[in-house]
């Protein structure tokens, strides 16, 4: 989004970028649209952002140990799901470069027609919990963004916060029961 904003001579600060992390593209576009405050359309922002991000998406790689963790969960028959803000189109691009993403049998994507709001709303995780038919209090979400963490915690799940962003971690522990939040740097 920083590169997209530059097209309109607008600099997105790190704090503003953090606010976008983990959210659906359409929700990010609406925020950036407000900040830029130029005579453009949200559709134009989305078009430019898609061009810029498609070149970067294929470079995304999993966190160290992520694939092993997914395979372990599958092998012991632990119910798992992928809950992402990525749209179906974006997920196709990501999973073509990262086929391990297809290990997840259950995927809740950002444009899922059965969720009304994306992260930080609890809707995406509530949908996954419903499909998996599990107790959210016995569920762990692994997140690296504030929006995703809020989404999981509001759905009454426990959180493994996978980030070195201490400010976000501190904010989360102030807003929610710290017993439900664990911080990890590496899997």
Q: Model segments located where?
A:
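Active-site neighborhood of HAD-like aspartate-dependent phosphohydrolases
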Residues: 1-18, 154
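Hydrophobic/aromatic ligand-binding patch that stacks against planar heteroaromatic rings
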Residues: 4, 72, 151
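A metal-dependent, Asp-based hydrolase signature
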Residues: 19-54, 72
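Short, acidic loop-to-helix structural element flanking the phosphoryl-transfer center
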Residues: 55-82, 88, 92
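Substrate-recognition "cap/lid" segment bordering the active-site pocket of phosphatases
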Residues: 59, 87-140, 146, 150, ...
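Structural recognition of alpha->loop->beta junctions
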Residues: 99-111, 170-187
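Acidic, Mg2+-coordinating phosphoryl-transfer loop and its flanking beta/alpha structural elements
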Residues: 137-181
């Amino acid at each position: 989004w920083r590169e997209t904003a530059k097209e309109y001579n607008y600099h997105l600060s790190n704090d503003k970028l953090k606010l976008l992390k983990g959210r659906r593209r359409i929700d990010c576009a609406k925020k950036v649209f407000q900040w830029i405050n130029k005579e453009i359309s949200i559709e134009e922002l989305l078009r430019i952002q898609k061009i810029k991000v498609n070149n970067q998406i294929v470079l995304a790689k999993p966190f160290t140990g992520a694939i092993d963790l997914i395979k372990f969960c599958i092998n012991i028959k632990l119910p798992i799901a992928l809950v992402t803000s990525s749209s179906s189109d974006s997920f196709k691009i990501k999973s073509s470069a990262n086929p391990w993403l297809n290990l997840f049998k259950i995927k809740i994507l950002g444009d899922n027609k059965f969720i009304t709001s994306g992260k930080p709303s609890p809707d995406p995780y509530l949908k996954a919990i419903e499909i998996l038919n599990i107790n959210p209090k016995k569920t762990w979400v692994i997140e690296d963004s504030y929006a995703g963490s809020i989404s999981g915690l509001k759905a009454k799940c426990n959180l493994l916060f996978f980030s070195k962003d201490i400010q976000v971690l501190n904010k989360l522990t102030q807003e929610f029961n710290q017993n439900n939040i664990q911080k990890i740097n590496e899997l």
